[in-house]
């Protein structure tokens, strides 16, 4: 387990059926999901999955319907019991926790936000937000203060005394987000939270969550079937197919180097210039003019800057710009109009 790892999953399996453990013990691991189902009558929903999530990052699990993404994420809190494997949070194995410790994890350290909001229709917005604090036994005044603070954080000032039926879908999802944040969890799990929303509201909620994450710096695990949403939201993305992870990487790594045709199919319609960075696209061999600019500390571009932010600066000039490592400041290459235009047309 690395120092900054918050969640580490190792060799997670989930088999659905009456004899799941026996079936897994005797399973030919080379069989496909359909072959296992045909031979045993059991369904392999998650197959030997391993990944880690760093503290404070947004880790996206992306896949089509039936890929196993929701089952996998429910294994993190044992809403679904893994058939085999380890789930460690802060080096504690969740699969070995007592019921008491598991309740503490779900109540105090982890919150979930679902596609269907799950709000109590008979409770006002402020009461819905404070529900998690209520079951913790937090005093009413403290509960109200924290709920109002979180209400304001998600942009619902003035809606505290309304009922869920009086709110739009996007506003109801904000209440669900506020309820999850109010208990100040270490980990937030989102199961396709925006997929039922209209496209415009969905984009607004994505932007809102990104903004909130910059402030609260929680560890987030976000499930989606939408690759565009995955690359927008995720620091790292795990792409699933048939219960297995096809590829894990940053959005840039996946767009630039898809490991197979399945992953490549997702990336083909993505505007690559919005994902790729100057460091990824830079020409490694620099001309003398570029080296001179670097020596002068003039007009250097950091390696982590996205290409789309450079278009206005570079598109109308023949000038070559030094690209420097965002951490060390060392010269790593150069970038010019031809590179920017290539990234826009590839």
What are these regions (language model features)?
Residues 25-35, 92-93, 134-137, 141-158:
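Conserved ABC ATPase "signature" region
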Residues 77:
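Helix-to-loop junction immediately C-terminal to a conserved catalytic motif
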């Amino acid at each position: 387990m690395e120092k900054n790892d918050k969640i580490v999953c190792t060799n997670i399996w989930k088999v659905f059926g009456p004899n799941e453990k026996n079936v897994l013990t005797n399973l030919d691991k080379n069989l496909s999901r359909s072959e296992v189902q045909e031979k045993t009558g059991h369904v392999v929903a998650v197959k030997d999955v391993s990944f880690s999530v760093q503290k404070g990052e947004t880790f996206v699990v992306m896949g089509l319907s039936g890929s196993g993404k929701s089952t996998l994420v429910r294994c993190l809190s044992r809403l679904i019991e893994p058939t085999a494997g380890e789930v460690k949070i802060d080096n504690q194995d969740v699969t070995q926790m007592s019921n008491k410790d598991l309740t503490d994890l779900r109540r105090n350290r982890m919150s979930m936000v679902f596609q269907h909001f799950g709000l109590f229709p008979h409770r006002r917005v402020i009461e819905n937000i404070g529900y998690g604090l209520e079951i913790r036994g937090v005093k009413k005044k403290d509960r109200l203060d924290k709920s109002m603070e979180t209400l304001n954080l998600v942009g619902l000032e003035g809606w505290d005394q309304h009922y869920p039926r009086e709110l739009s879908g996007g506003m109801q999802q904000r209440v669900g987000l506020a309820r999850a944040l109010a208990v100040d969890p270490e980990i937030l799990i989102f199961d396709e939270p925006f997929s039922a929303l209209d496209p415009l509201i969905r984009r607004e909620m994505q932007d809102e969550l990104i903004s909130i994450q910059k402030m609260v710096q929680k560890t987030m695990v976000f499930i989606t079937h939408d690759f565009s949403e995955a690359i927008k939201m995720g620091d790292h993305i795990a792409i699933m197919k048939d219960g297995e992870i096809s590829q894990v990487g940053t959005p840039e790594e996946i767009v630039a180097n898809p490991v197979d045709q399945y992953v490549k199919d997702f990336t083909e319609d993505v505007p690559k210039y919005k994902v790729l960075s100057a460091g990824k696209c830079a020409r490694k061999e620099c001309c003398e003019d570029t080296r001179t600019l670097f020596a002068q500390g003039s007009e250097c571009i950091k390696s982590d800057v996205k290409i789309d932010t450079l278009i206005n600066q570079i598109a109308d000039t023949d000038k070559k710009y030094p690209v420097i490592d965002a951490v060390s400041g060392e010269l790593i290459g150069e970038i010019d109009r031809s590179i920017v235009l290539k990234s826009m047309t590839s």
